[in-house]
């Protein structure tokens, strides 16, 4: 992946809903990022999103000039995509001005961190979703692809926009729907300027190893032993109970 290293970030507007504390002890109950604007010279491309507590609420498809809501429940709301298009146009103008005035120093490429896990506990043959979390992304230019047994997978794949972090880096999540099988393994392939070569994060379903014949024999023997002990103990208690009843009858009334 040959990528141009010229990059410029747009303004990041954050609105924070704070808990009613004061001074240095203020802790955020919820954090909303309204109008996360990103424009870069690579591509060139831009991004406009709204986020709440780290989740993407919607983004504006700049090519189709429409708002895309990430959850069906949010589609009752409206957002004029023209607002985002205007913001991106302003960022593009500012970027061009800054490039002319700068010495074109490249941004520092951070090394992304990749984690792969399943959405729910894995049962072979039952639908599930693999999640590839790519964290610490900067600059926000990355390729994320899925491989199954070494072959590229395109069906059932979706991903988020670049989601902002407080340290001004980004993270991105890619999803893969699948039917887990003992014959298939998966890799999340990540390409980024901060990596010397593409990074592959491997995942395969964990299948409990079958018990050996010796283990099965030991388990059966232990179960049989416990059962026999229970029978013997129960018999002893029954005999003692019968003897106690017989003794009380022979004593008769005082």
Swiss-Prot record:
Effect of residue 25 to G: In allele DQA1*01:04 and allele DQA1*01:05
Known glycosylation sites: 103, 143
Keywords associated with the record: Adaptive immunity, Cell membrane, Disulfide bond, Endoplasmic reticulum, Endosome, Glycoprotein, Golgi apparatus, Immunity, Lysosome, Membrane, MHC II, Signal, Transmembrane, Transmembrane helix
Reported effect, residue 49 to S: In allele DQA1*03:01, allele DQA1*03:02 and allele DQA1*03:03
GO molecular function, one term: peptide antigen binding
Effect caused by changing residue 161 to R: In allele DQA1*06:02
Assembly: Heterodimer of an alpha and a beta subunit; also referred as MHC class II molecule. In the endoplasmic reticulum (ER) it forms a heterononamer; 3 MHC class II molecules bind to a CD74 homotrimer (also known as invariant chain or HLA class II histocompatibility antigen gamma chain). In the endosomal/lysosomal system; CD74 undergoes sequential degradation by various proteases; leaving a small fragment termed CLIP on each MHC class II molecule. MHC class II molecule interacts with HLA_DM, and HLA_DO in B-cells, in order to release CLIP and facilitate the binding of antigenic peptides.
Family named by the database record: Belongs to the MHC class II family.
Official protein name in the record: HLA class II histocompatibility antigen, DQ alpha 1 chain
Naturally occurring in which organism (per UniProt): Homo sapiens (Human)
Taxonomic lineage from the root: Eukaryota, Metazoa, Chordata, Craniata, Vertebrata
Gene name tied to this protein: HLA-DQA1
């Amino acid at each position: 992946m040959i990528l141009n290293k010229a990059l410029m970030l747009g303004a990041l507007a954050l609105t924070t809903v704070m808990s009613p504390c004061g001074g240095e002890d203020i802790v955020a109950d919820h954090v909303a990022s309204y109008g996360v604007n990103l424009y870069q010279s690579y591509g060139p491309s831009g991004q406009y999103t709204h986020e709440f507590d780290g989740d993407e609420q919607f983004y504006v498809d700049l090519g189709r000039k429409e708002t895309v809501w990430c959850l069906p429940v949010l589609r009752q709301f409206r957002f004029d995509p023209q607002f985002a298009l205007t913001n991106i146009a302003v960022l593009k103008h500012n970027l061009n001005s800054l490039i002319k005035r700068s010495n074109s120093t490249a941004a520092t490429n951070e090394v992304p961190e990749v984690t792969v896990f399943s959405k729910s506990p894995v049962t072979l043959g039952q639908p599930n979703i693999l999640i590839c979390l790519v964290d610490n992304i900067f600059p926000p230019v990355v390729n994320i692809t899925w491989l199954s047994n070494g072959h590229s997978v395109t069906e059932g794949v979706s991903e988020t926009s670049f989601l902002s972090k407080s340290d001004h880096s980004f993270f991105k999540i890619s999803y893969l729907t699948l039917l887990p099988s003992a014959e298939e393994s998966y890799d999340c392939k990540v390409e980024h300027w901060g990596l010397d070569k593409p990074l592959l994060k491997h995942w395969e379903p964990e299948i409990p190893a079958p018990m050996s014949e010796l283990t099965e024999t030991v388990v059966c023997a232990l179960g049989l032993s416990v059962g026999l002990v229970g029978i013997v103990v129960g018999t002893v208690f029954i005999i003692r109970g019968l003897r106690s009843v017989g003794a009380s009858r022979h004593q008769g009334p005082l």
